[in-house]
């Protein structure tokens, strides 16, 4: 079952975020989820949805926001997948698709005509997962550390 994240989901939501971003800390993730639950930056600019396991607990999350620009996009109100994670034992079951479709519906209801997302080499399965849902790669970015 896909539903908006709730206050009671704090521990499981934090667990999913730590699985997605293992270089983060529990304290950082707790701060992030508490800020979100307190309404930051704004319920009209960001949403989070989770998938509930039939046996209890959560097995996936998607966090979506609204950006005014994104690589390859043509409009100034873009739904943006900020986070998308499904526990390994639920991958390939349709949970990831359902989560993204829920995020897209939220963005569409908020007036967005496009969706965007990003990924990096730390997530080798991510490009294929995005493409399976109709996303296409639009640009390649580079950076250089000047320190």
How would you describe each model-predicted region?
Residues 1-15:
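A short beta-loop-alpha structural element at the N-terminal edge
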Residues 50, 57-66, 80, 85:
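Conserved beta-strand in the GNAT
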Residues 38-50, 80:
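A short helix-loop-beta-strand connector motif used in the catalytic cores of GNAT acetyltransferases and
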Residues 97, 109, 121-139:
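Conserved active-site alpha-helix within GNAT-family acetyltransferase domains
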Residues 82-86, 92-105, 128, 132:
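Conserved acetyl-CoA-binding loop-helix of GNAT-fold acetyltransferases
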Residues 74-88, 140-143:
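Conserved acetyl-CoA binding element of GNAT-fold acetyltransferases
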Residues 14-38:
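Conserved GNAT-fold acetyl-CoA-binding loop/helix
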Residues 107-119:
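Conserved GNAT acetyl-CoA-binding A-motif
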């Amino acid at each position: 079952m896909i539903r908006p994240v709730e206050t009671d989901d704090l521990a499981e939501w934090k667990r999913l975020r730590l699985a997605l971003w293992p270089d983060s800390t529990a304290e950082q993730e707790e701060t992030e989820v508490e800020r979100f639950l307190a309404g930051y930056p704004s319920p009209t600019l960001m949403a989070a949805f989770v998938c509930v396991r039939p046996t209890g607990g959560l097995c996936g999350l998607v966090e979506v926001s609204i950006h005014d620009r994104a690589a390859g996009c043509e409009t100034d109100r873009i739904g943006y997948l900020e986070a998308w994670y499904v526990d390994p034992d639920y991958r390939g079951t349709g949970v990831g698709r359902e989560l993204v479709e829920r995020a897209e519906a939220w963005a569409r209801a908020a007036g967005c005509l496009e969706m965007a997302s990003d990924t990096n080499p730390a997530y080798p399965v991510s490009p294929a997962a995005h493409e399976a849902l109709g996303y296409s790669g639009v640009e390649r970015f580079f950076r250089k550390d000047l320190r």
